[in-house]
Amino acid sequence: MSAIQNLHSFDPFADASKGDDLLPAGTEDYIHIRIQQRNGRKTLTTVQGIADDYDKKKLVKAFKKKFACNGTVIEHPEYGEVIQLQGDQRKNICQFLVEIGLAKDDQLKVHGF
């Protein structure tokens, strides 16, 4: 008869947690860009998921200057600090974040109509 060599239990997810430290910081986190309807034709664009390493107030200042819109940083109970901009700035924000190297194109998730 053949002897069974491997009698140890196997955890299929054990190796998945070992490789996490090899990834650069922020590669698995997504930046969510959403649009919300206000009254009439007015809209708000929200940006959520930017790492805490970056100063969000300075980012808002750059967004406001580049896109000629108003914006602020709000504290959301579920998502933490969220950037809020007036108008539909989804494409502009995507281009800007990739341009300055803050995020890669596959890290950006754009939501909305």
UniProtKB/Swiss-Prot annotation:
The coiled-coil regions, if any, are none
Gene3D superfamilies noted in UniProt:
SUI1-like domain
A biological process from GO: translational initiation
Site, Binds 40S ribosomal subunit: residue positions: 41, 65
Q: Which PROSITE patterns match?
A: SUI1
InterPro entries assigned: SUI1 (IPR001950), SUI1_dom_sf (IPR036877), SUI1_euk (IPR005874)
Role according to the record = Component of the 43S pre-initiation complex (43S PIC), which binds to the mRNA cap-proximal region, scans mRNA 5'-untranslated region, and locates the initiation codon. Together with eIF1A (EIF1AX), EIF1 facilitates scanning and is essential for start codon recognition on the basis of AUG nucleotide context and location relative to the 5'-cap.
Protein name as it appears in the record: Eukaryotic translation initiation factor 1
Species of origin: Homo sapiens (Human)
Lineage runs: Eukaryota, Metazoa, Chordata, Craniata, Vertebrata
Tell me what gene encodes this. EIF1
